[in-house]
Amino acid sequence: MAASKAKGKLVSIVINNEYIKICEITKSGKNSVVHKTVTIPAPEDCYVDGVIEQTDVLAKAIKVVMDEHRFNANNVAFSISSPRLATKEVLIPNVKANKIDKLVQANATEYFPVNMDEYIIQYTVLEKVEDQGQEKIKLMVAAVPSEVVESYYGLAKALGLKVAFVDYAGNSTYQIMKQQIGPEVSLVIQVENDGTVINIFKDNVLQLQRNVPYGKSMLVNAVMEKYGLKYEAATTKLQNETLLHSRFDGDEVTESLRYMASNINRVIDYYVSRNRLSIQKAYLIGHSTSIKGFATLLSNELNMPIEKVERLKNIALDKKAYVEEATLTSYVTNLGAVIDPVDFIPKRLIESGARKENTKTLIVGFVGALVVSALLVLIPLVQVVALNAEIGSLNKLSLIHISEPTRRSYIS
C-alpha cells in the first residue's frame, strides 16, 4: 500500500553494517531532483539484522555529516533491508482499493508462518491478472518485525526529523527499475553488502522478487583473507584490479561468489519453468557495478549478456549542488524509496490513531446528540412562547375601547 506522499525536500537514508547512504531529494511528479548525496562508514555494532542499535551513536554520526553538507530537509524516508523481512506474491479477489488492506491483514497468517503480533504487514499492488477465468489482483506482500520499524522511528527522533515513510529495499528497487527497463522479460540483479535482490519483470511489472543472503561482503571478506587487508582497502582493490576470474575455476576469491550465482540461477529456472518464458534482458545494479570483472563472471555463469545500469532515467541533478551523475546508481535504493513507497508504521501509532479517531467520532456523536436534544426541547418551547404571545395579542385587541364617533364613522 503506497504511503501518502510527503511534499518538498526529503532526506532518504539507507543503512547496513558497512555504510550509511544519505540523499536529499525533491520528488516532483515522475521525476526526482537530487540535491545532495553522501556515504559514510557505519559505526560498528549499530546495525544488527536490520535493527538499529546504539541509536545515539548512529544519530551523531549522521548529524555530523548532514550538518557538514548542509542538509536542511525536515522529513526523512528510510528504506530498510533485513534478513528477517519476508515478501510473497499473492493473488486476491478483484476488490475495491479501500478493501485490500483489510483483506491482506485478515489473511496475513496464511502468507507468513510467524506471530503476526510481532510483525507489520504492507503491500504493493502490482497488476490485475486473470486466474481460472476470474479477474484478480496481484500483490507483493511484505512482513517486517515491529522492532525493526520501531528502531528506525527511534533514529528519526534522535535526528530531530519527522518520518515521512519507511519503505523496504525490494520495493524501492522495483519502483526505480521499472522506469529504467523496457517491456521485455528482464532480470534485474541488485547486489548489496549483505544480500542480493533478484527481480524479474515483464511489461515493466514485477513478476518475481527473491532475496538471497549472499552479497558483496562475501567477496570482500575473501579478498581480506587472501591479501591481509582491512574491509575498505579490500573494497578499493576490487574496484581497481581485476581479481575475479571469468569463470569459477577454484580461485578462492572468485569462488566466494558461487553461492550467489547458484541462487540467481535457481530463481531464473523457477520462473522459466512456471511461466515458459525465457529471460530476454539482464541488468546489474548497485555496488557490484564498480567491481572489475563482476558483470563478466555473472554473464558467463548465467549464460546471458548482462548490462550494467550506469545512468538513471527520471533523475535530475540540482545544478547548484555538486553531485556526480556516475555515482547515482549506487544510491538506487535511496532514490527508489521516494517514488511510491509502502509505509511501515509502528502498531502503537496505528492503534493510537484509531483511538483518536474513535474518540473524535464519540465527541462528534455526543455533540450531535446534545444538539438534537436541545432542538427537541427548544422547538416546543419556542412554539409555546409564540402561541402565548399570539393569545396575549388577541386579548389586548378584545380590550381596545372604540369611541362612539369612531364607531359611527365605520358603520355609516
Predicted regions and their residues:
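Residue-level detector of conserved catalytic or cofactor/ligand-binding positions
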Residues: 397-411
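Hydrophobic/aromatic-enriched cytosolic interaction surfaces used to assemble or bind macromolecules
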Residues: 1-398
